[in-house]
Amino acid sequence: MTNFTFDGAHSSLEFQIKHLMVSKVKGSFDQFDVAVEGDINDFSTLKATATIIPSSINTKNEARDNHLKSGDFFGTDEFDKITFVTKSVSESKVVGDLTIKGITNEETFDVEFNGVSKNPMDGSQVTGVIVTGTINRENYGINFNQALETGGVMLGKDVKFEASAEFSISE
């Protein structure tokens, strides 16, 4: 069994969504945690739970962030966390239940496992993964949108994300 300690200072969770049919808006969740258990040498034994604090959303625009925290989007007064609980893990895919605003759907995401390294600062063993994927926000009750005079809508329904997580590990 491998002991995993999440390193939030060396991890990130970023997303992007199409805006006005012509560009992308990017942002991040600044507070999240990932708990992992299992044997790093046997991916089939790995189980993980990611917990994201949606009120930590950061798009570098306070007014937009406040709107994203409202009931039009994440409803952070009522729904204080987003969770992803794995069902299966391989070296290239992770399948699990994603819950946003109390709505749970099974999702499959891509995984890039980056091996194990020794941290020269303290001698600890570290590992990292990058998880990428796309979710349809409307599947989670995030339906806010506005029609554009030129056709199309203000916001795309697909949200792309990249989560980079680093862990100290020990046996």
From Swiss-Prot:
It comes from the Bacteria. Belongs to the UPF0312 family. PANTHER family: PROTEIN YCEI. This is UPF0312 protein SAS2572. It comes from Staphylococcus aureus (strain MSSA476). The lineage of its organism: Bacteria, Bacillati, Bacillota, Bacilli, Bacillales.
